[in-house]
Amino acid sequence: MAASPYSIFAVQLLLLASWMLSSSSSNFNQDFNIAWGGGRARILNNGELVTLSLDKASGSGFRSKNLYLFGKIDMQLKLVPGNSAGTVTTYYLSSEGSVRDEIDFEFLGNLTGEPYTLHTNVYSHGKGEREQQFRLWFDPAADFHTYSILWNSKTIVFYVDQTPVREFKNMESIGVPYLRQPMRLFSSIWNADEWATRGGLIKTDWTQAPFTTSYRNFRADNACVWAAKASSCGLAAGGNAWLSVELDAKSRGRLRWVRRNQMIYDYCVDGKRFPRGVPPECKLNLHI
């Protein structure tokens, strides 16, 4: 039986309300749920700040109430100061189900005075193994910095303080699945001392616990909320130019600078890991 005009209108109102909610000023009470960790995850300052903590018993995490299908998402993070070795702070988009799409920022802790490793990965249709790692050009525990994901039908770009550090293009034309599932935003802190710092050689020093990461200024102004099997971007008048944005010449130059000066691992040049040849997308990504 065909849906009535009234039910269609109700769905449209729901989507418009979701879009307006996501475009308003950040409020963690409004936008997120604590996912795990109990009192280790705290929403403070009337919803303006979140802290996630890790102790020997457990880590903690939160997730967005909304699902997104394409978007530009920003969050400011201040990472664990001092001896953060063995800890991992995550900030990522992920779909539901076993054949997942995922866009990962992970911050691997280190000894006091040693740099964090920014670990990135992309899963498309359940396939990952696309790790790239970087050293940041600042201390991410000294102050808040902005980490952003641009995801549209043409490309995915990882940004740090508006500087692009990684791009994953739509390469369906050569048989590489692209990310097209609705995703939530997640963040967490947890213990990974079996691998996180120097391949697991440095273990977590629990005398330094609790380890705490802070979050503020979440923005999803340019993000398509997915609800009732429809996208809010079909209702928003204008403001969706980012849906077709790609890196311009200036941004591509900044990306090349990051790759030359800050990248410490790239799966696309790991011949030992891929003795039969690197994945097909690498042939395009090497020429940026």
UniProtKB/Swiss-Prot annotation:
Q: What does this protein do?
A: Catalyzes xyloglucan endotransglycosylation (XET). Cleaves and religates xyloglucan polymers. Does not catalyze xyloglucan endohydrolysis (XEH). Overexpression in Arabidopsis transgenic plants causes accelerated dark-induced leaf senescence and higher lipid peroxidation of the leaf cells. Overexpression in transgenic tomato plants promotes fruit ripening and softening. Probably involved in cell wall restructuring during postharvest fruit softening.
Which sites are catalytic? 102, 106
Where in the cell?
Answer: Secreted, Cell wall; Secreted, Extracellular space, Apoplast
EC numbers, comma separated: 2.4.1.207
The name of this protein is Xyloglucan endotransglucosylase protein 8
Where in the chain is the site Important for catalytic activity? 104
Query: What does the record list as GO biological process?
Result: cell wall biogenesis; cell wall organization; cellular response to gibberellin stimulus; fruit ripening; response to abscisic acid; xyloglucan catabolic process
Spell out the molecular function terms from Gene Ontology: hydrolase activity, hydrolyzing O-glycosyl compounds; polysaccharide binding; xyloglucan:xyloglucosyl transferase activity
